[in-house]
Amino acid sequence: MSWFSGSTVPVADLESKINEATSESIPNGELDLAIALEITDLIRSKKIPPKQCMRSLKKRLTTTHSNPNLLTSTLKLVDLCVKNGGYHFLVELSSKEFIDYLVDYIFKIHYNTKDSYVIENEAKYKVGSFILSLIKDWTLVFENQTQLNYVERSYHQLMNQGYEFPESEVGGQLSNKFIDSEAPPDWIDSNECMICYNPFSLMNRKHHCRSCGGVYCQTHSSHNSPLVALGIMEPVRVCDNCYEKIKSKNSKHLSKVRQKKTPSQPTDEDLDDEDEQLRKAIELSLRETQVPVSKQIPPPRSPSPVVANNTGEEEDEEMKAAIAASLKEFEQQERMYKQQPVASQQGYQEPQSEFYRHILPFDQQDPSYQNQNPSQQPQMTPANHAEQYHLKPQVEDLSQQEEESINLFITLMNNIKSDPSKQANILYDSNLSELHGKIIQLKPKLNKSLRASIEKYETCLELNNKISTISRLYDQFLEAKLNQAYGNHTISSPYGGPNQSFQGPYPSQTSNEYVPYPVDQRVSSPQYQQSPPQFQNYSSPGLSQQPTGYNNYPSIGQASEPSNQPPASESMQNTSQNPQEPPPTSFYPSYYQESDSETTQTNQDNGTPPYYSSKKTSEGNRNEPEYPHQSTYPPQDLNGSFNQNAPSQPNYNPPLPTEPSYPPFEQDDDAEDHAAAKFPSINELNSEEQTTNTGGKDDNKVPSMPSMPQFGQPSQDTDRKSKLVEEPLIEL
């Protein structure tokens, strides 16, 4: 049963706060102190029954007993609730249900300091020692409390069992005051008002005061006020007597704070007004942001010494710290103004960069540009550039403490905005007023820092744009230079000729041109002694190039200059006037073979020797082919230099000669006579046989077949003579 109807906090909310305060994300067994204090206020305000609060903490111990870090943080939360939860919660916590579970199950089973496994595990041993230290501290705190004596009984049992309790750091300072936390009192039931003593009826209803627990009528319990000392942060119903006590206590506290803040000034109601304080803060901010033009900045005035109060009240520690901080800040400001140069005290003019002014005449109407001689233009050195930017004052950023103050003020204002009950008591919150004054003083500094950051961003953005433009121009200039360099690139001839420039990529090969392989000049042959004409543009029409086993090289005209190449019509005329011979068969085994008639006719018309000539051997009339006497060396001029129009090819070794193929025998008009002379007819053989046997007299005798020649015997056709073809002379 909850004490206050309409403001009951569910148990799920309490359990979620407990889980959040002892979260796994918090390392080293620590807890979130802010949420833990909210839990203690929730327990102390009696919004949730104390037994249910104890069972929620016990449930968290059950779920985290296997993790030493989470168990340590949960035990720290339980200890904080013991010191701030109120006496009604201590009664439930020191009951047999919670203490036996903590000692008999968690400590003796999982974290027993006598167990060897726990002793070897350092983390578990620390948790066991921490449980023993908590039981010892609670025993000292609950001393002479009859309702809390079960903790002391468990402590003596553990001592009798031989457990050693660690020495507590604050054991000698612990007393009953550690658990003296105010809690809402129990309600008193009565049939009449405790102030006017009017009996309660249907029209005069009964109300309880949350501060004292008494029963009052509507007339004497119409005030609402937060009870911070009892852990109640929202305004609740109080009686007239309790309201006057709370009001007098708050007024004394406010007057004490005002006397400490302004002890030399007389207390006046106008000075306490919030509007007056806001006006002073605005004037102070305007005075700080104002920049003098020609006047010297006056040094800050030293703060007047604090006059001791005649009442003899001791100064608060926070006020002493504030006075020390103000004195330290005054000394720093005075030291800064002494070190500030006189030139910087005059009107500050924003420096203008001269780095990009004289690159291009952007503004020729500028008088500084017209009056200045280009030869006398000052050069922008890095030192001068650094000196100009060194004169610019540096804006101080917000410190970490100032940022925390701003964030705290924002958080408090958001809480007040969401809670309408706190808005009525905002005038009585002295801490919030003091924090508001500090935030107002930080506003000019924050504006300066923001303006400096924006200017720095714009400057960096402008420099980035300039760098991008310059990089693009440089890339375009470099690309143009590279294209020009590649266009003028030349390749020298391997035979000492003039350089040949490449204009564009290699043209595609549209014809299959046979180019003889160059032969090293060191290789010589006795049978190649004549210098034949130069081979140029020999191609086989209608025949694809056959693989020869060697690398294919480009044609002659592919790597030559355009000025050295004759037109296509001139090339055809030169070919018809000066026909050239194909390459030797030793270089190209597979070549196009012309018919005998075409070869003979071409040789007779041009007066050139045939491709092959036959010579008579000593063994008989057998004709064997004879290779043409042509050199495979590049053609040379009269002065011994190589021809420039010769193909530019690397100097490879000559390939090995292949098996020559015999050309077809020449056929003339007397071929039938030759065949008849060499191979006589059957009639001639019969007549010759008859003449041989009968001497030409016996014609009726049957002729016999000629005898076949035996293997190894010399041929009997030596008398037969073949008609030799006369070899024409070679034109040199």
Swiss-Prot record:
Composition bias, Low complexity: 364-379, 524-541
GO molecular function list: phosphatidylinositol-3-phosphate binding; ubiquitin binding; zinc ion binding
Subcellular location: Endosome membrane
Domain of life: Eukaryota
Keywords: Endosome, Membrane, Metal-binding, Repeat, Zinc, Zinc-finger
SUPFAM superfamilies: ENTH/VHS domain (SSF48464), FYVE/PHD zinc finger (SSF57903)
Biased composition (Basic and acidic residues): 616-627, 717-726
Composition bias, Pro residues: 652-663
ZnF (FYVE-type) ranges: 187-247
Listed name of the protein: Vacuolar protein sorting-associated protein 27
InterPro entries the record matches: ENTH_VHS, HGS/VPS27, UIM_dom, VHS_dom, Vps27_GAT-like, Znf_FYVE, Znf_FYVE-rel, Znf_FYVE_PHD
Polar residues compositional bias, start-end: 491-513, 542-579, 592-607, 629-651, 683-695
GO cellular component terms, semicolon-separated: endosome membrane; ESCRT-0 complex
Disordered: region residues: 253-274, 289-318, 364-384, 491-732
Domain UIM: 273-292, 314-333
Family: Belongs to the VPS27 family.
Recorded topology in the membrane: Peripheral membrane protein
Comment field on protein domains: The FYVE domain is involved in the binding to phosphatidylinositol 3-phosphate (PtdIns(3)P) which is required for the association to endosomal membranes.
Function as written in the Swiss-Prot or TrEMBL entry: Component of the ESCRT-0 complex which is the sorting receptor for ubiquitinated cargo proteins at the multivesicular body (MVB) and recruits ESCRT-I to the MVB outer membrane.
Binding site for Zn(2+) 2: C209, C212, C239, C242
Example of a GO biological process term: protein targeting to vacuole
Binding positions for Zn(2+) 1 per the UniProt entry: C193, C196, C217, H220
Assembly behavior: Component of the ESCRT-0 complex composed of HSE1 and VPS27.
Pfam families: FYVE, UIM, VHS, Vps27_GAT-like
Residue span(s) of domain VHS: 23-166
Gene: VPS27
